[in-house]
Design a protein with these regions (language model features):
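Non-catalytic beta-sheet/beta-sandwich ligand-binding modules that flank or precede catalytic cores
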Residues: 1-222
Length: 222
């Protein structure tokens, strides 16, 4: 039988959950704190028998038959987030039926079953897991559901993802490289269209006169 041992976990005094003088089985517990160091959690056990003979101190992790426990308090994050459109003229613009694509790369493995929840303009995107650290999200713009942001940058939201330890990542609402896509569903118009002749009377034309058609649009025309 032993005296109640002195036990530390993560260099902090542990609570002896069971066992007392004269018993041979003890359980020690400690709740990890945000101030504790990351990495393999050290522990130590100092003990004596009832005759006060001191045993050889046990320390982590060489004496841990389970291989130790690693403390991870770092939440995962996406170090690369880019957005683009499959618009045939400009990948930074989108019209109705254009597909928006988000490409994401995380700094550590995202646990299976906690793939990020991603919305594009408030609509749930289809998320594909390419690897434990790589994801692709897509959404096709539609009318009238997306009409409210006509002429605006398409908002994104990335949330509800975690690593193997259970650390939850921060919600993201912006790309990492400054990329963006602007939604434009308004058809261009030509509010001003005039025709004239270089004839003395510009509303008349004779053989050899040059006609000029002047067009003004309400936005840039490709």
């Amino acid at each position: 039988p032993l005296q109640t041992p002195s036990i530390t976990i993560a260099n902090n005094a542990a609570s002896i959950a069971s066992g007392s003088n004269g018993e041979s089985v003890y359980t020690a517990t400690y709740t990890m704190q945000s101030s504790d160091n990351t990495g393999v959690i050290p522990f130590s056990v100092d003990f004596k028998d009832l005759a006060n003979n001191e045993g050889v101190q046990i320390i982590a992790v060489i004496n841990d038959v389970d291989g130790g426990v690693t403390f991870d308090k770092q939440a995962p994050s996406f170090t690369s987030v880019t957005i683009s459109s499959d618009n045939s003229n400009n990948t930074a613009l989108a019209i109705v039926n254009d597909e928006i694509t988000l490409e994401l790369t995380s700094d550590e493995a995202i646990i299976t079953g906690t793939d990020p929840t991603i919305t594009i303009n408030g609509n749930n995107a289809s998320v594909t897991r390419n690897s434990t650290t790589s994801f692709t999200a897509t959404y096709t713009m539609s009318s009238p559901s997306d009409d409210g942001i006509d002429g605006s940058v398409i908002p994104i939201n990335i949330s509800a993802y975690s690593d193997a330890t259970g650390n939850v990542g921060t919600t993201l609402t912006a790309t990492t490289d400054g990329s963006f896509v602007t939604y434009d569903k308004t058809l261009p118009t030509l509010p001003t269209v005039t025709i004239s002749s270089d004839n003395t009377y510009d509303h008349l034309a004779a053989s050899g006169d040059e006609l000029t058609l002047t067009i003004a649009s309400d936005e840039n025309i490709n």
